[in-house]
């Protein structure tokens, strides 16, 4: 097979996979809107209560699952290129923890309950600070994969400790509700909270279009400069975009781990590392994974609802362990 035929075949395979993923997402979305404590049949007219349940509860929650899953998956894929580490992920590296810590600080310092916009800004600042710490340490100290993971885990533990202290000394009910939410939950998502989505979506689309630039960065700084990339400027733009996505995702749904690790890594294993295709496919696959996980979180138990973060951790942790073993065997 000639080179141009091979490239055309590969592009066709990526596009076919993208269409299949979109179809799966649409089917799961329809199922998501139907199932729950009250089953909504698509073949019968809805009562006023059922219509309100669909429009005011299930639809905004479905949208939250989609945008959070897409944002985390694309952020993970971008971080893996920026840090040169296939195991990089916002939750594992402690970046999500930094966003949650900033939100708790905002909750303590402000005299009134912060609005979703204030929470979002605090989360973005926290994610940006932790991302800069990681990128700075990785570049200055030339950290190996294992050492970078240790630094990320340490940052996550540190932020988690501060958050736990804050909850322990607080009698405020809102803080206790926030603690459940920080475990990863979109149960309280409403249209009001989707002000955050208005900020997230343009950044997500922009980042999905940066695939060719990321492909050049993967060749190394020297080659990227020769190919016309302003590496310094591009790196800072990508860091800011990733921080905005992670901050918005945490503000909307709390800490949801492993989506940004599992989705891009499995897609790379199956289809290759071309970021111009990988990033859009990661967005659809991340959205699909989170919609699927939240269906299980809502329906697995009759008497309670599981935090979404628990479901993604249950799915992602075994895959993460397998990836660590595989990485060790490769060396």
UniProtKB/Swiss-Prot annotation:
<keyword id="KW-0472">Membrane</keyword>
<comment type="similarity">
    <text>Belongs to the binding-protein-dependent transport system permease family. FecCD subfamily.</text>
</comment>
<keyword id="KW-0813">Transport</keyword>
<feature type="transmembrane region" description="Helical">
    <location>
        <begin position="190"/>
        <end position="209"/>
    </location>
</feature>
<comment type="function">
    <text>Part of the ABC transporter complex BtuCDF involved in vitamin B12 import. Involved in the translocation of the substrate across the membrane.</text>
</comment>
<feature type="transmembrane region" description="Helical">
    <location>
        <begin position="277"/>
        <end position="296"/>
    </location>
</feature>
<feature type="transmembrane region" description="Helical">
    <location>
        <begin position="62"/>
        <end position="84"/>
    </location>
</feature>
<feature type="transmembrane region" description="Helical">
    <location>
        <begin position="117"/>
        <end position="136"/>
    </location>
</feature>
<keyword id="KW-0812">Transmembrane</keyword>
<feature type="transmembrane region" description="Helical">
    <location>
        <begin position="303"/>
        <end position="325"/>
    </location>
</feature>
<keyword id="KW-1133">Transmembrane helix</keyword>
<feature type="transmembrane region" description="Helical">
    <location>
        <begin position="240"/>
        <end position="262"/>
    </location>
</feature>
<dbReference type="InterPro" id="IPR000522">
    <property type="entry name" value="ABC_transptr_permease_BtuC"/>
</dbReference>
<keyword id="KW-0997">Cell inner membrane</keyword>
<keyword id="KW-1003">Cell membrane</keyword>
<feature type="transmembrane region" description="Helical">
    <location>
        <begin position="20"/>
        <end position="42"/>
    </location>
</feature>
<dbReference type="Pfam" id="PF01032">
    <property type="entry name" value="FecCD"/>
</dbReference>
<comment type="subunit">
    <text>The complex is composed of two ATP-binding proteins (BtuD), two transmembrane proteins (BtuC) and a solute-binding protein (BtuF).</text>
</comment>
<dbReference type="GO" id="GO:0090482">
    <property type="term" value="F:vitamin transmembrane transporter activity"/>
</dbReference>
<dbReference type="InterPro" id="IPR037294">
    <property type="entry name" value="ABC_BtuC-like"/>
</dbReference>
<dbReference type="GO" id="GO:0005886">
    <property type="term" value="C:plasma membrane"/>
</dbReference>
<feature type="transmembrane region" description="Helical">
    <location>
        <begin position="148"/>
        <end position="170"/>
    </location>
</feature>
<dbReference type="InterPro" id="IPR023691">
    <property type="entry name" value="ABC_transptr_BtuC"/>
</dbReference>
<feature type="transmembrane region" description="Helical">
    <location>
        <begin position="91"/>
        <end position="113"/>
    </location>
</feature>
<protein>
    <recommendedName>
        <fullName>Vitamin B12 import system permease protein BtuC</fullName>
    </recommendedName>
</protein>
<dbReference type="GO" id="GO:0015889">
    <property type="term" value="P:cobalamin transport"/>
</dbReference>
